[in-house]
Amino acid sequence: MAPISIADIVAALPAEDTWGPATASDNMLQGVPYAPFSKGDKLGRMADWTAESKDPNRAGRQAYNRNYRDQQVYGAGSSSLFAVQVAEDESSFSVVDNTRSSAKRTFGRGGGTVFRGRAQRGGAQRGGRAGFQRVGAGRGQGGDRYYDNRSGGRGNRGRRFGWKDYDKPQRTREPSVNVRPDWNMLEEVDFSRLSKLNLEAPEGEDVDSYGFLYHYDRSYDKAPVKNAERRLQSLDRAAYNVTTTQDPVIQELAEKNEATIFATSDILSMLMCAPRSVYSWDIVIVHQGNKIYFDKREGASLDLVTVNENAADAPLELADSANKQDAINTPSALAMEATFINHNFALQTVVESEDSKVSLAHPNPFYNAAEETEPLASKAYKYRRFDLSLERDDEPVNMIVRTEVDAIMKNPVNGEDQQLLVKALNEFDSKAQGSGGALDWRSKLWSQRGAVVATEMKNNSVKLARWTTQAILAKADGMKLGFVSRANPRSAAGHVVLGVVGYKPRDLAAQMNLNLGNGWGIVRTIVDRIRALDADEDEDKVTKYVLIKDPNRPVLRLYSVPATTFEEEEEVAAEEQEAAEEEAEE
């Protein structure tokens, strides 16, 4: 073989200055669409013309397209139409169910519990007022319309929550009272600002006490015997819920200039726990001279005990087209049921014995033995004074609060009397919408009591916070929380007592992270604002304000209203109650 010379190799090189394979002008793959693929996947088809396309212009798709991409992307290992289909693959095999599915039964027929209201006769002469407000008495003025009202065909059925929540109907609530055209909004404060307020919590001192107390029945503290549940009884006892301005004792203390601010514990506790509230409520503030009264309307929402107000999926009001069989689980019906339970539970858990009755300094100020036919309920009214003064104040700022205690109990160690506040939590159905993921009390109350109480603290944060605040304001030694459930989840007529748990108010406040200093800071801020608004007014002029919690936002609004607001409505309500009593007697 002839040797190859280097000169021949150099002569055979191309004349161009490029390096590599020869380039051609024509490209065989020009115009062929490119489909993304993974080099690790086998190709079973050349192209996919049947894939479902995403419409980028559809409303609400922006968030989806931002977080989710097509399956056919580079590196995607999920199966697609491009993948090779194995002949014996059983993943595509499915069975068609042609059986007729039966509709799920919901709750049976049931109306709300009939809660009988009662009023104090001769209340206008003695400054009294209706005892237990008749449920629905204020509906014409929006008395109980602060609950949820969600439209749509879903009724009150539950649903799963996910990324498509933007496409669901929004939950809306009605205000507790309708804002009238002649009302002037003065202030709007959100809860984030209220939560930053703080005032050193005063201890308080007793000014006077009225009423009497029966001893608490300790047998309710024991675990119930199996198949021997205690029924909740409906007892007829005279109980009163008199507002601040119509309390004859507060009127007497105001004339003696014992304080400059007056309120009741149920009204004050709502204001102090305002950042925890969800439903709408309202408080009437009356400023006369140098006196400020925190008052409430006739039939106000403050008189009702809410149920699962703070739950993530709170109970819903039924729409017009919804299933009427679930009417007993609506917020308004549950509130009426819970108010009925709390009233009767406090009466049932005491031993009504005249020998062991503990009478306070004065008799019940709202009871008239000549006109009343029902016996008095065990109740003590303690009027306590709190010092809200600051260093910048020229004169002391004192507040008198009417607090309440339900029963008394002997201390097992030293034998001293301990005053108790008795309240009840109620279970309607652990499987129904609005239950808030609560456990079944019948099977879990004594075995998993901590989990049951923790769930109630989450779902009823504002209710438990108000009760704890009322107990601390009254300087009660203990609290008794009863657990009451329906005898039948489909009926709100019968209830059973499953157990009672005792707490010290301060310990329960620590468990709930309840800061009373924040509550006193809210009260002092409202008082300072009212005084600043009326700084230039005459001392004899009466000014009235309404503080309203927004039904759908964590906001408080302060309105200036005419001095005669709500007075005509209260007179009409009083006349209706008197007429109803006369008809009942006939």
UniProtKB/Swiss-Prot annotation:
Annotated GO CC locations: cytosol; eukaryotic 43S preinitiation complex; eukaryotic 48S preinitiation complex; eukaryotic translation initiation factor 3 complex, eIF3e; eukaryotic translation initiation factor 3 complex, eIF3m
Span list, region Disordered: 102-176, 567-586
Subcellular location: Cytoplasm
Alphabetic keyword roster: Cytoplasm, Initiation factor, Protein biosynthesis, RNA-binding
GO BP terms: cap-dependent translational initiation; formation of cytoplasmic translation initiation complex
GO molecular function: mRNA cap binding; translation initiation factor activity
Region (RNA gate): 301-315
Assembly behavior: Component of the eukaryotic translation initiation factor 3 (eIF-3) complex.
Family classification: Belongs to the eIF-3 subunit D family.
Protein's job: mRNA cap-binding component of the eukaryotic translation initiation factor 3 (eIF-3) complex, which is involved in protein synthesis of a specialized repertoire of mRNAs and, together with other initiation factors, stimulates binding of mRNA and methionyl-tRNAi to the 40S ribosome. The eIF-3 complex specifically targets and initiates translation of a subset of mRNAs involved in cell proliferation. In the eIF-3 complex, eif3d specifically recognizes and binds the 7-methylguanosine cap of a subset of mRNAs.
Database matches in PANTHER family: EUKARYOTIC TRANSLATION INITIATION FACTOR 3 SUBUNIT 7, EUKARYOTIC TRANSLATION INITIATION FACTOR 3 SUBUNIT D
Name of protein: Eukaryotic translation initiation factor 3 subunit D
Lineage: Eukaryota, Fungi, Dikarya, Ascomycota, Pezizomycotina
